[in-house]
Amino acid sequence: LGFICHNVSLVAQSFNMFVFFRAFLNARKIIKEINPDLLHCITLKPCLIGGVSARRSNSPVVISFVGLGRIFLYNTVPMRILRALTVLVYKYIAGNKRGVFIFEHDKDRRKISRLVGIDYHKTIVIEGAGINPDIYKFSIEKKHEIPIVLFASRMLWSKGLGDLIEAKKILRQKNIHFVLNVAGILAEDDKDAIPLELIHHWHNEGLINWLGRSSNVYELIQKSNIVALPSVYPEGVPRLLLEASSVGRACIAYDTGGCDSLIIHNYNGLIVKSNSAQELAVELEYLLKNPQIRLEMGANGRKRVKELFSSILVINKTLQIYKDTIGC
């Protein structure tokens, strides 16, 4: 594709300022050597590094937020300090007259605009990273003797698997059963990680069907009847829900992050109040008992992806931002 890659060592969960400053210096050296027409920075640390570099040289820069991340989720003293410092740096970056801030949904746009004081005309929403509906083809869900619900994510508590298991326990007491397929990436060094021992315990108890890391989530979605992501993590637009909607599966999610920018309640899925396993169980029961409703929601989800979330739309909007930013 013609990409030339330059390696800069960054540790995702590290708060070591020495390591971060070293990465900043290395990245700035590379940026100076390349002298790019435009910088496009994605996720927190690259945005801070690239944004500061661009501000210092008054260069065109695009800052992309793919959700706000845990720094805007937790209220521990260290996180509040980091959040305050991050906001200060973003205020500095926002002083670049040739900078644009992209968000995946309007909640993040409004929050960062308020905290940082960004001019509204310098912000834009592009709905997610986009998905190709021709690759994630629509299919009618298969009938199973016991319905299949899919959860696929990093194995973090904040992604909602714990609440989903509580909902399953509630429904099991009412003699309502489903297979909970769980696929995901272990995050062993993360403080929010679900221990592998507990995952195996849930599997052995029949609460989940642990599939481990999957290289073909598309196939898992096709085999499922419902896709669930009760996440409280400050998401962008979750890839899992995009893929599930494109394939035509009814989705159930919490009212956080970008989940409810894709899922419209009672149209292409169900939105549940965050941190409510009881309500999650009620809404999940509704989907399990109403296959025709699921089919209608699946068709609506496919339509919504094609109209607003397709990769070609995202690409065209992004390229236009490049042209406008370089030309300003």
What are the functions of these language-model segments?
Residues 140-159, 164-168, 180-181:
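Conserved donor-binding/catalytic core segment of Leloir-type glycosyltransferases
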Residues 250-253, 263:
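Short hydrophobic beta-strand element within catalytic cores of glycosyltransferases
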Residues 41-47, 65:
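Short His-centered aromatic/hydrophobic patch
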Residues 193-214:
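Nucleotide-activated donor-binding/catalytic signature segment of Leloir-type glycosyltransferases, i.e.
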Residues 6-7, 87-138, 148:
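Donor nucleotide-sugar binding/catalytic pocket of nucleotide-sugar-dependent glycosyltransferases
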Residues 279, 286, 293-308, 314-320:
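A short, well-ordered alpha-helix in the C-terminal region of glycosyltransferases
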Residues 265-266, 270-277, 286-291:
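Conserved acidic donor-binding segment of nucleotide-sugar-dependent glycosyltransferases
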Residues 152, 179-194:
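Glycosyltransferase donor-sugar binding loop
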